[in-house]
Amino acid sequence: MIKVFRTSEMYLIAAEAGAHLGGEKLTQGNKYLNDFCKKRYSGYTEKTYPTASQLISQVLLERKREFIGEGMLWSDLRRTHQGFQRESTFDIDEEYNKINNIMFKYGMNLKYDADDYRFVWPIPKDEIDANPQLKGQQNPGY
């Protein structure tokens, strides 16, 4: 499968890299983020994030907006060692809840700490069976 990289992703990667490298690269990271935002928001006014953590926070926010529904957030949370919590705001019918308890018990309110084992997928059994070097190995928690 070919992974398609959009120009917007490259701008955000460059902005975050500049923040991590610091110094002159922090200035360059701000430029990449401003260039990205100018193309997304009409009337955008350039901003300067003076610290790496501020710039990274803004880049991650833009990544959430830009790549919604594309499966990027999971990787970002893992890469930046962040957990997440999602709480349901749905009004749940108690009778329906009795019928479909699994969904409402396990699917509506979620909390994963940053080091939760579920951030790493299990190694598929077929792969373990096909590769003798993987015999007896599995990612923690599975």
Language-model regions, residue ranges each:
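Acidic/polar-rich alpha-helix caps and helix-coil junctions
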Residues: 1-142
